[in-house]
Amino acid sequence: MLIFEDSPVAQLTFFYDLSSPWTYLAFNNVQEVIAETQATVSWRPFLVGGVFNAVNQSVYAARANPIDPKVIHNFTWLHEWARLANLPLDFPTEHHPVKSVLPMRMCCALEHDQEVLKAFTKAAFDAYFADGRNIDDPLVMADVAKSIGLDGEALLSRAVEPAIKDRLRANTEEAISKGAYGSPTMIVDDAQLYFGNDQLPLVRQALAG
């Protein structure tokens, strides 16, 4: 146990996009960190494409050059990290890079209930990265919602409401204002920013105080 009974409870803000394979890993791996440190967590859906457009357009150049050694090694490391975490990974598939606007809006529609959002997020990650399904397909996403007991059609309807669109935009802008440049962006106690699955040991250390 990394936290004493009278220690202040640390807060983790986890900005994420369902299209990111590294976020799939981090979302699953961070659960143990949260349990160990007894931190409170806020799951914050955002649109990583909006982040890239604002502050990290070099990502698109890298995607355009698939023979770049860094890109090749990143895919190798990605699968090694998945094996280390004992997570199934079917990636990349024909759906990559997937448009994530629809699923991220659906996440925003659930943000008021963090436990339900967490369950939906896991189911959506599994659909895309473990099962190779297209999360830009409304039928797939309705099925994902139904798999955890939600009304898929109702959630799809909520996802196109102006307030939900505004929420996704606001989350993305907030993440950018805090220094985000990709997914996942993890912020401890609204102060320390961490990025990526490989920085989870640092997140653990920061949360433990």
Residue ranges, per PLM feature:
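Short, charged low-complexity linear motifs
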Residues: M1-L2, M106
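C-terminal cap of thioredoxin/glutaredoxin-like
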Residues: I3-R44, H112-E115, A119, A123-G209
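Structural alpha/beta surface segment adjacent to cysteine/selenocysteine redox centers
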Residues: Y24-Y128
